[in-house]
Amino acid sequence: MDVDERLHQDENQTHPFSQKKSSSFLIKEKAATKSKDLEHIRLRDLNFNHRKKLDDKKLAKQIPVKANFKKPNEIEARANLNSNELTDINLDYIPDSPSIEKISGPEDSIVVTPRNIIHLQSDSDIILEECEHNYDCSPFYRLFNYENRIEPDDYEAIINAIITDEIAGTYPVFERELEYQELKSLVRKRDYIMYYFLSRDYRGFFQLKEERTLFYRYPSIAYTSPLRYLDNGSETEQFTGDDDEELQSFDFENTSSVRTLDSNIWR
């Protein structure tokens, strides 16, 4: 068989396939032209029928909504209550007293007992009397050169005390030194102007400064300062002889009142 005959035979075999292909293409083209017409346009299904329906059991039950809702009044609410349901109010409620041996915990729990519990002995006496005296006292302080004060007219003892402290390097301290240092840090220029031009000492700093200057200028004042326990006057006043006799007869052990050095207030 020649080559030309084979080519002609192959063309005859492929011709019916091309005819079938062209016929199917024409059918699709006709369908596409029909879909462009307004009469054949298909709208989207808004009911979602294409979705899978749920079972009736899984659907939630619809609750009807009241059209006219009216809020009940307080009188109507009270009328709906039965008198048998109400009880008396317990005004005398007394809670349980807490105890060291019992610690509150959740319900149905075992009572927890601490290890170290303070128990009173059976033969111990408990004092249940009310204390008449006031046992509150001021902080303890050391009286500097007040226990053995020197008389103002004993010049030899005063000079001896001054020389002894000068050699030992111990000097008397102004009793209101802390107050002086605190006021000194608070004083400003306007306080000096008000004091020197208008004689106004609002903080009391300048009066305290004069007392401190007098204290260090005359050291004998530190060694002859009187006791301040029974002094009801000002701090600059001195004791008299009658006050000394009263001081000697005063019973310090049976008194519960203690006075500070910086004030005349009994505590």
UniProtKB/Swiss-Prot annotation:
| Keyword field contains Zinc | no
The record's keywords, sorted A to Z, are:
Cell cycle, Meiosis, Sporulation
Which regions span the lipid bilayer?
none
**Record bears the keyword Signal:** no
Q: List the biased-composition ranges (Basic and acidic residues).
A: 1-13
Biological function: Indispensable for spore formation.
Name of protein = Meiosis-specific protein ISC10
Q: Which organism is it from?
A: Saccharomyces cerevisiae (strain ATCC 204508 / S288c)
The organism's lineage?
Eukaryota, Fungi, Dikarya, Ascomycota, Saccharomycotina
Report which gene this protein is encoded by: ISC10
